[in-house]
């Protein structure tokens, strides 16, 4: 039996479709015959239902995965307020310990063939005074998939994020263009520019360009993603 694969999903900003793309990837992996699970290790913004605290992003990931992880493994740190996690954690008296997340990820790898780990916010979102989301990806040792919210300014945001990923020694396995502004002029030209720059500077392929969907459908979006290309990149990046 081959070792499980895993990837870390980050984005150019918050609210640009990381959960949507992560869910679409889960559908694609399941269609490829893989047992696919998801982690949202740090989630900020919770609601109470049936006496338990839940998070909408984590719920969406659970709905897309064909392997359900225990909540304590899927989301080791569930914060109540929807704000910057290090600020909320300090106010709620929670220490966002990266080691705890690494242990949870190790356990998740025992339950599935592929694990999608969705980060919180962008790649440099602080988790503590001196640790950020990129440090988490480094500790997990995972290749990164970058979700680019296609809107005005996305070229600079994407290239800066890719530089931050490379600066930590993390492989950029690929990127996804997610059209969050349906009225954006020259969207295709922006995507073409990013395709050329990210391929040239980081050898990061475009995994798919997702049309704006209302309402969003991760299952439908999964058909626009090149899951086999991503799987090959993950296998190439896996420890020998």
Swiss-Prot record:
GO molecular function, one term: ATP binding
Similarity comment text for this entry: Belongs to the dethiobiotin synthetase family.
Binding of ATP, residues: 15-20, 57, 118-121, 178-179
Cofactor: Mg(2+)
Protein name (database record): ATP-dependent dethiobiotin synthetase BioD
GO terms of biological process kind: biotin biosynthetic process
Coiled coil ranges: none
Keyword set, alphabetical order: ATP-binding, Biotin biosynthesis, Cytoplasm, Ligase, Magnesium, Metal-binding, Nucleotide-binding
GO cellular component: cytosol
Protein function: Catalyzes a mechanistically unusual reaction, the ATP-dependent insertion of CO2 between the N7 and N8 nitrogen atoms of 7,8-diaminopelargonic acid (DAPA, also called 7,8-diammoniononanoate) to form a ureido ring.
Cysteine pairs bridged by disulfides in the record: none
Subunit structure as annotated in this protein's UniProt entry: Homodimer.
Location(s), subcellular: Cytoplasm
Catalytic-site annotation from UniProt: 40
Pathway membership: Cofactor biosynthesis; biotin biosynthesis; biotin from 7,8-diaminononanoate: step 1/2
Gene3D superfamilies: P-loop containing nucleotide triphosphate hydrolases
PANTHER family in UniProt: DETHIOBIOTIN SYNTHETASE
InterPro entries: DTB_synth_BioD (IPR004472), P-loop_NTPase (IPR027417)
Chief localisation class: cytoplasm
Enzyme Commission number: 6.3.3.3
Catalytic activity: (7R,8S)-7,8-diammoniononanoate + CO2 + ATP = (4R,5S)-dethiobiotin + ADP + phosphate + 3 H(+)
Residues the record lists as binding Mg(2+): 19, 57, 118
Domain of life of the source: Bacteria
NCBIfam families, alphabetized: bioD
């Amino acid at each position: 039996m081959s070792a499980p694969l895993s990837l870390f999903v980050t984005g150019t900003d918050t609210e640009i479709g990381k959960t949507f793309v992560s869910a679409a990837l889960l559908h694609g992996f399941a269609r490829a015959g893989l047992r696919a699970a998801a982690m949202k290790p740090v989630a900020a913004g919770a609601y109470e239902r049936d006496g338990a605290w839940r998070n909408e992003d984590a719920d969406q990931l659970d709905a897309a995965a064909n392997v359900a992880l225990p909540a304590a493994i899927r989301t080791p740190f569930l914060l109540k307020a929807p704000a910057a996690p290090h600020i909320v954690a300090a106010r709620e008296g929670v220490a966002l310990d990266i080691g705890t997340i690494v242990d949870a990820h190790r356990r998740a790898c025992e339950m599935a063939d592929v694990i999608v780990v969705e980060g919180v916010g962008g790649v440099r979102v602080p988790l503590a005074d001196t640790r950020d989301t990129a440090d988490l990806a480094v500790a997990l040792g995972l290749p990164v998939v970058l979700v680019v919210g296609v809107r005005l300014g996305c070229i600079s945001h994407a290239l800066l994020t890719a530089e931050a990923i490379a600066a930590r020694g993390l492989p950029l396995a690929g990127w996804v263009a997610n059209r969050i502004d349906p009225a954006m002029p020259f969207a295709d030209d922006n995507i073409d520019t990013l395709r050329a720059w990210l391929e040239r500077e980081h050898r990061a392929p475009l995994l798919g360009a997702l049309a704006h969907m209302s309402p969003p459908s991760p299952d439908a979006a999964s058909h626009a993603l090149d899951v086999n290309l991503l799987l090959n990149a993950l296998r190439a990046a896996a420890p020998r």
